[in-house]
């Protein structure tokens, strides 16, 4: 029942929300938002377990699949689409599904979140298998679309995890690993796009970033698998080579082009004073980890 969910309770601090001036509303929101990171902190051990499972999937050439409805689904897609430019992944490695399909990203599709079978259809469409990890996201922790997806994922032997913003969430029963970030009542009653959505975004940031570090997509604190898809990222790539090696911008740019715009290879070429082919071979042996290649 909705009334039993803490995310649906009325916030005692904002009973007069409609009487506040603009600054008071903003201060109230900011005050509530400060509690979110602390709520996430309490779940770090559970998030760590999820990351380990995702890394294992990646090492076995499996995928990370997010499923959710409404804001939760949009946040999963947002995290997924940022992985290729940030970490050089292909667009299949991390994917997001939203109840009602991609059109639901910009406009609500009535009733889609209430149909368990839609998630099964979505996961079947990508050939979900036992190497993959499916993470179901639902602020309420009770969305049928997410439950249906987790049920199907379990049936094919995939790893499963859930992210919710209520304790003892319904979706936790259907996932092998659970993250329950208790964000409590929103300033606007039931509007879980606020604190709950912020918490979900923080957790997704943690999962994708830590997992990519775990498979060699980062050297020191540099995103060395960045894809140079625009001028800003081309410049960032050259700056990463400068930061990683200490050479001048000009030398970094030269090696960047010699390495066919492969930042990792350029770094190895500079630091080991080797040719492009040798750098690639060292990275292959090191399974993509720059530090190991060096």
From Swiss-Prot:
Pathway(s) the chain acts in: Amino-sugar metabolism; N-acetylmuramate degradation
EC number of the protein: 4.2.1.126
Keywords from the UniProt entry: Carbohydrate metabolism, Lyase
Pfam families cross-referenced by the UniProt entry: GKRP_SIS_N
InterPro entries per UniProt: Etherase_MurQ (IPR005488), Glucokinase_regulatory_CS (IPR005486), MURQ/GCKR (IPR040190), SIS_dom (IPR001347), SIS_dom_sf (IPR046348)
Enzyme class: lyase
Catalytic activity of the protein: N-acetyl-D-muramate 6-phosphate + H2O = N-acetyl-D-glucosamine 6-phosphate + (R)-lactate
Catalytic residues (positions): 82 (proton donor), 113
All residue ranges annotated as the SIS domain in the record: 54-217
Record-level GO BP terms: amino sugar catabolic process; N-acetylmuramic acid catabolic process; peptidoglycan turnover
Family the UniProt entry places it in: Belongs to the GCKR-like family. MurNAc-6-P etherase subfamily.
Free-text function comment from the UniProt entry: Specifically catalyzes the cleavage of the D-lactyl ether substituent of MurNAc 6-phosphate, producing GlcNAc 6-phosphate and D-lactate.
Quaternary structure and partners: Homodimer.
Matches recorded under HAMAP family: MurQ (MF_00068)
PANTHER family assigned to the protein according to its UniProt record, in alphabetical order: GLUCOKINASE REGULATORY PROTEIN
Note: A lyase-type mechanism (elimination/hydration) is suggested for the cleavage of the lactyl ether bond of MurNAc 6-phosphate, with the formation of an alpha,beta-unsaturated aldehyde intermediate with (E)-stereochemistry, followed by the syn addition of water to give product.
Protein name, entry field: N-acetylmuramic acid 6-phosphate etherase
Designated gene of the protein: murQ
């Amino acid at each position: 029942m909705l009334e039993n969910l803490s995310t649906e309770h009325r916030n005692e601090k904002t009973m007069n929300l409609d009487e506040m001036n603009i600054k008071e509303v903003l201060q109230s929101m900011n005050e509530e938002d400060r509690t979110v990171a602390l709520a996430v902190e309490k779940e770090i051990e559970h998030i760590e377990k999820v990351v380990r499972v995702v890394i294992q999937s990646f090492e076995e050439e499996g995928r990370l699949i997010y499923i959710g409805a409404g804001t939760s689904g949009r946040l999963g897609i947002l995290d997924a689409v940022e992985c290729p430019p940030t970490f050089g992944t292909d667009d299949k490695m991390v994917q997001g599904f939203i109840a009602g399909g991609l059109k639901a990203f910009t406009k609500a599709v009535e009733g889609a979140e209430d149909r368990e079978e839609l998630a099964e259809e979505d996961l079947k469409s990508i050939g979900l298998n036992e190497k993959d990890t499916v993470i179901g996201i639902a602020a309420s922790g009770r969305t049928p679309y997410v439950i249906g997806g987790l049920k199907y994922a379990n049936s094919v032997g995939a790893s499963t995890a859930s992210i919710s913003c209520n304790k003892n969430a319904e979706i936790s029963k259907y996932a092998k690993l659970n993250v329950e970030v208790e964000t409590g009542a929103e300033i606007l009653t039931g509007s879980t796009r606020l604190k709950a959505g912020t918490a979900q975004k923080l957790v997704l940031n943690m999962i994708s970033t830590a997992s990519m570090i775990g498979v060699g997509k980062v050297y020191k604190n540099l995103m060395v698998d960045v894809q140079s898809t625009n001028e800003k990222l081309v410049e960032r790539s050259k700056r990463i080579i400068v930061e990683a090696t200490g050479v001048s911008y000009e030398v970094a740019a030269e090696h960047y082009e010699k390495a066919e715009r492969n930042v990792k290879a350029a770094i190895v070429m500079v630091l080991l004073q080797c040719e492009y082919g040798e750098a690639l071979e060292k990275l292959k042996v090191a399974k993509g980890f720059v530090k190991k290649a060096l």
